[in-house]
Amino acid sequence: MKLKRMLAAVVAVLLVLVMMFTGCGISKRPAENADKDNSQSGKPEIVNIGSQQMPDDEKVAIAKGFFEGELGTKVNVIEFQAGDIRNAMIANNIDFALLGSSSAALGIANGMDVELIWIHEILGDAERLVAKNGSNINSIKDLKGKKVATPFATTTHYSLLKALELNGISERDITLLDMQMPDVYAAWQRGDIDAAYAWEPTLSNLLKNGKTIISSKDMAAKGVVTLNVEIVRREFAKKYPDIVTKYIKALNKAVVLYNQNQIEAVRTVAKALNITEEEALKQMKGSIWLTAEQQLEPAYFGTSSKKGNLAGSLKDTADFLYKQKSIVSKPKLSTFEQAVNPSYIENALK
């Protein structure tokens, strides 16, 4: 009988441990009870975070457990490819989402009911147009008649189209293919494409047999700035504003770690993405991470009383997408001013 009681106790402990750890993992789908209140705390039982495989502050925050620590509730991280994450947000399958500024501008212009609450990074050398060795592509003008791949409605797509425009080349002059990053690399290996505008980790693989034609850093110098940003469902934010503020605190904590202990941040990203620390450092240095204080500067969010340039930048992106017929009607600046909300960053700094 004693043995049976001991075995029962061990099983009970194991069950408790399983229940503890299944609430904080990376999933492929949203938790069904995502927007239910925890009757004891008034918090959602589970927060669904839409993420992507990127070497950024969110990856650090996830790997370090900053979200669980700040939010005080279960966190379910769902990994997406670039185009799918916006659709998941539209379907209310996730509460938070990381996506490019072009995708955010497209979604907001088309009525996606979200608030933009954080800039993950200003994109630079982390996104580049790469031409395959032997393709005879040495400049943007050499893309005429070539097959070029990138995921549509993303920052790379936007940068590519702007690069073509600045060089007097029509989209019709090239064969432009809509591919997610894993498909880009597969097509590259098969010899199906001549060039691709890509981000990490696919970018590093392309550069093994290719060369950079232009980077998003080069495009930024020409006035074409692209970002990765965080959005939240407006309904969720209205119901749980304190959770959104704490979410910002977790992200800022990751940025501070990167600034104060780069080695630890790099090690964390390398392990999370299953790449070497050298690769992680190179990828992370390809973009600029902003602290919460920096995000409130006029060049970005600005403040609640005086909005900064971010809304205007999104409007410019949307205007270009409208010209490309990706958006049915031209959006007003006020549409983006209403979506850009610096108050959560302001509250996180109090």
Residue ranges and their predicted role:
Residues 1-46, 345-350:
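Short, low-complexity disordered leader/linker segments with a strong preference
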Residues 29-170, 175-178, 194-197, 216:
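Short, glycine-/small- and polar/acidic-enriched structural segments
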Residues 51, 60, 82, 97, ...:
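Solvent-exposed, acidic/flexible segments
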Residues 59, 65, 69, 87, ...:
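Solvent-exposed, polar/charged alpha-helical surfaces in well-ordered, non-transmembrane soluble domains
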Residues 102, 177, 183-273, 278:
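Pocket-lining segment of extracytoplasmic ligand-binding domains
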Residues 145, 208, 341:
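Phosphate-coordinating loops and pocket residues in cytosolic domains that bind phosphorylated ligands
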Residues 239-326:
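Secondary-structure end/capping motifs
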Residues 312-350:
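Conserved C-terminal helix/tail region of periplasmic/extracytoplasmic solute-binding proteins
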